[in-house]
Amino acid sequence: MRLEDLQEELKKDVFIDSTKLQYEAANNVMLYSKWLNKHSSIKKEMLRIEAQKKVALKARLDYYSGRGDGDEFSMDRYEKSEMKTVLSADKDVLKVDTSLQYWGILLDFCSGALDAIKSRGFAIKHIQDMRAFEAGK
């Protein structure tokens, strides 16, 4: 899932065809459901990546503290105060952390998309009300 793809998809979904207001109003529920599914899928993926991050942190902590399994351990010794910096800069942990941050951006975007779909429903209602007013009803 890419942010650019989600942006393009939202751009198409928020468009209101003023010649089909009844259809657009009915379709709004389906659009909200679609984006809610995307939101929950992204949240689920973030939980999986958070678990991966914990495993990676534990493995790298064991590596740097010399408690690693077998022959894999760091010859460098770090103080406890240095360990936090060393772990956060480790390439394995950094890769997982970057992935988690990217999925966080996707989650924020989907949350905004849900708000946009809600606003779309209100906009459709206002257009219908304005047309009724203009027709003298």
Swiss-Prot record:
One GO term of the biological process aspect: DNA recombination
* Subunit structure comment from the entry: Homohexamer. Interacts with gp32.
In its UniProt entry, what is this protein called? Recombination protein uvsY
Q: Which UniProt keywords apply?
A: DNA recombination, DNA synthesis, DNA-binding
Q: Sorted alphabetically, which InterPro entries does this protein's record hold?
A: UvsY (IPR021289)
Which Pfam families does this entry report, sorted A to Z?
Answer: UvsY
- Taxonomically, the superkingdom here is Viruses
TM spans, by residue?
A: none
Gene Ontology MF, one = DNA binding
What is the role of this chain?
Plays a role in viral DNA synthesis by promoting enzymatic activities of UvsX recombinase, by promoting UvsX-ssDNA filament assembly, and by helping UvsX to displace bound gp32 from ssDNA.
What is the protein's species of origin?
Answer: Enterobacteria phage T4 (Bacteriophage T4)
